[in-house]
């Protein structure tokens, strides 16, 4: 039977206006419940699918101890996914059905994870780019969330994501200091940077954030979060001598993207077309998923499905 949140929208707004956290269904309205379920699902799905994505690339680790570091990160990601799914279970969601019985295309996570990571270079860049995106998003939720159980759980998640970032940045610095490694790193960065720019979703001009911001599902808009991410990534890449199509504009005090965005992407070749397209075309690509979607989800569901 569907769990019904008992509060009205006005009661929830009054509860939040008083500075109180939402601790469970007893404090939720149907609209709040729908929203928090959605953001928890996106978060948990993202953490879960990162595991097979990272494991694929970890096979290219240069040494056994490096493989061990990658596996430690994967274990963290699975634990983070468990937090999200466990909270969804508390909110009336059938966890086994959600994880093991959904079709692959129904999973909600950034398109970037549908593109295979085929080298150690791409794994450490994923730690430096994708995990930075995750850190920006979850730090915003940690600071702004009105859902108490998740807010408290994210204190641990933030600390572990810092390790993932450090792992990626340490390797990027090491590779960038060697001309041969740097060239291979740059080749992967060329497709991964722009793909991570998409991570934060539609631009503010095309997306309404009303309920998300009002109910504290997030504290910043998509464009603000994208700016935060560039604020971490662009200076770092400049520091190590890697090229990214973005720079800080002193006049506007904002980061500016120096390439057509969004643009066409060839998921098989991992190449950008260089021609600007509309966000409606990007949405078609996102909804159609990418080449690894079914493979990764099948791997995650294999033990359950037999």
Predicted segment positions?
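Extreme N-terminal leader/anchor segments
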Residues: 1-28, 32, 293-306
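Internal, conserved structured core segments that host functional sites
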Residues: 115-167
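Conserved alpha-helical segments that form or flank metal/cofactor-binding pockets of metalloenzymes
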Residues: 2-11, 73-101, 168-173
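Glycine- and acidic-residue-rich phosphate-binding/metal-coordinating active-site segment common to enzymes
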Residues: 144-196
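Extended, helix-rich structural scaffolds rather than catalytic motifs
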Residues: 183-306
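Helix-loop segments that flank and shape redox-cofactor active sites
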Residues: 50-72, 134-150
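Acidic/His metal-coordination segments adjacent to aromatic residues that form catalytic metal sites
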Residues: 21-41, 101-127, 144, 178-179, ...
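Alpha-helical scaffold segments that form or flank carboxylate-/histidine-based iron centers
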Residues: 32-43, 61-80, 123, 149-161, ...
């Amino acid at each position: 039977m569907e769990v019904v949140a008992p509060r009205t929208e006005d009661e929830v707004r009054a509860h939040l206006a008083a500075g109180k956290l939402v601790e469970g269904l007893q404090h939720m309205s149907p609209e709040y419940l729908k929203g928090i379920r959605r953001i928890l699902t996106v978060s948990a799905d993202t953490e879960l699918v990162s595991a097979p994505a990272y494991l694929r690339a970890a096979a290219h680790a240069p040494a056994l101890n490096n493989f061990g570091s990658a596996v430690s990160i994967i274990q963290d990601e699975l634990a983070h996914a468990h937090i999200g799914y466990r909270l969804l279970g508390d909110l009336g969601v059938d966890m086994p059905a959600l994880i093991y019985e959904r079709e692959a295309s129904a999973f909600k996570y950034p398109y970037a994870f549908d593109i295979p990571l085929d080298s150690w270079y791409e794994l450490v860049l994923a730690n430096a780019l994708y995990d930075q995106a995750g850190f920006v998003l979850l730090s915003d939720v940690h600071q702004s969330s009105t859902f108490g159980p998740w807010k408290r759980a994210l204190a641990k998640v933030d600390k572990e994501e810092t390790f993932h970032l450090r792992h990626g940045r340490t390797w990027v610095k090491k590779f960038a200091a060697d001309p041969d490694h740097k060239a291979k790193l740059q080749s992967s960065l060329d497709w991964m940077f722009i793909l991570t720019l998409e991570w934060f979703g539609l631009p503010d001009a095309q997306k309404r954030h009303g309920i998300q911001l009002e109910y504290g599902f997030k504290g910043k808009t998509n464009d603000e979060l994208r700016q935060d991410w560039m604020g971490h990534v662009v200076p770092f890449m400049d520091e190590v001598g890697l090229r990214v199509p973005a720079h800080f504009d002193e006049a506007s005090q904002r980061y500016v993207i120096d390439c057509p965005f969004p643009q066409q992407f060839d998921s098989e070749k991992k190449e950008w077309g260089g021609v600007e397209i509309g966000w409606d075309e990007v949405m078609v690509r996102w909804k159609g998923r990418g080449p690894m979607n079914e493979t990764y989800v099948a791997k995650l569901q294999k033990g359950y499905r037999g």
